Amino acid sequence: MAQRVTYRRRLAYNTRSNRTRIIKTPGNNIRYLHIKKLGTIPRCGDTGVPLQGIPALRPREFARLSHNKKTVQRAYGGCLSANAVKDRIVRAFLIEEQKIVKQKLKQLSSQK
């Protein structure tokens, strides 16, 4: 007859937070091993692509990390992807160029 196993925590329902695996201990007992939930990969705020260089952890574990493991060394590092930052820089540059052109045209029209 198979050995019976019971949950090792108080929660007695088969929920996502109570997932288990059956393992065999060195003492040859069969026991439930509670599995931790997987963390989600941080994503870019603009494009929604997964961020490179930042681990997928649960919120509590992520809060315990040191600062340099939560970010990458770049503007908006840890919030936006590299392509999104590049697009923002190019867009800002083009807008500034457009402002300068508009200003020059205004000066030329006022001189005439």
UniProtKB/Swiss-Prot annotation:
- What are the entry keywords? Cytoplasm, Ribonucleoprotein, Ribosomal protein
Q: Which GO terms describe its molecular function?
A: structural constituent of ribosome
- What superkingdom does the record give? Eukaryota
**Where in the cell?**
Cytoplasm
Coiled-coil positions = none
What is a biological process (GO) this protein takes part in? cytoplasmic translation
**Chief location of this protein?**
cytoplasm
| GO CC term, one of those recorded | preribosome
* Main function: Component of the ribosome, a large ribonucleoprotein complex responsible for the synthesis of proteins in the cell. The small ribosomal subunit (SSU) binds messenger RNAs (mRNAs) and translates the encoded message by selecting cognate aminoacyl-transfer RNA (tRNA) molecules. The large subunit (LSU) contains the ribosomal catalytic site termed the peptidyl transferase center (PTC), which catalyzes the formation of peptide bonds, thereby polymerizing the amino acids delivered by tRNAs into a polypeptide chain.
Query: Can you state the subunit structure given in the record?
Result: Component of the large ribosomal subunit (LSU). Mature yeast ribosomes consist of a small (40S) and a large (60S) subunit. The 40S small subunit contains 1 molecule of ribosomal RNA (18S rRNA) and at least 33 different proteins. The large 60S subunit contains 3 rRNA molecules (25S, 5.8S and 5S rRNA) and at least 46 different proteins.
State the remark under miscellaneous: There are 2 genes for eL34 in S.pombe.
PANTHER family annotated for this entry? 60S RIBOSOMAL PROTEIN L34 (PTHR46595)
**What's the protein here called?**
Large ribosomal subunit protein eL34A
Native source species:
Schizosaccharomyces pombe (strain 972 / ATCC 24843) (Fission yeast)
